[in-house]
A protein has these predicted regions:
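Long alpha-helical, hydrophobic tracts
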Residues: 8-87, 91
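A glycine-rich, acidic short-motif signal
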Residues: 56-153
């Protein structure tokens, strides 16, 4: 039994959060992400997917770039009012960077930073959302650079 030229088959499949998370984690592990970093990246991808922001699609567009290129080293002495991602994915650098910036909030009520050469800032949103529950808010302003303001309320 075949399809006519104008017929389309639509299949709707749903997955649980756990299925998306574990499969994403396996993918990141296979891409060379270290233990812990693979969990952070899987959380980011799954959060975006669950919120309807196409986390899996975004991941599939980045796979070639991420394959065996994991490098999440951040030099804290180079983090001032601007941070250069050097076109590395926020999936790699984002978790450590956001944790560091949140630690700066302990010493100040407000911290402003511009992200330079960040080609995938959408991956920072789930990381910042986690801290919203702790009365730490953030704001993104997109222009040539990504400006972020992180504030402790």
């Amino acid at each position: 039994m075949g399809f006519c030229y104008y017929e389309f088959l639509l299949i709707f499949v749903s997955y649980s959060y756990y299925e998306v998370y574990t499969n994403s984690q396996r993918a990141f592990s296979g891409l060379g992400f270290t233990h812990g970093a693979d969990e952070d990246a899987a959380y980011i991808t799954t959060w975006l997917e669950v919120c309807g922001l196409d986390g899996i699609k975004l991941l599939s567009l980045k796979i070639a770039e991420l394959d065996n290129t994991f490098n999440a080293i951040i030099d804290p002495s180079k983090i001032r009012s601007e941070f250069d991602f050097h076109n590395q994915s926020a999936l790699m650098i984002g978790p450590g960077l956001i944790d560091y910036l949140i630690s700066k909030i302990d010493n100040h009520n407000e911290f402003k930073i511009s992200f330079k050469n960040c080609n995938d800032p959408v991956f920072l949103i789930p990381l910042l959302y986690k801290y919203a529950k702790k009365n730490i808010s953030s704001q993104f302003i997109s222009s040539q650079k990504i400006n972020a303001q992180i504030t402790h309320n």
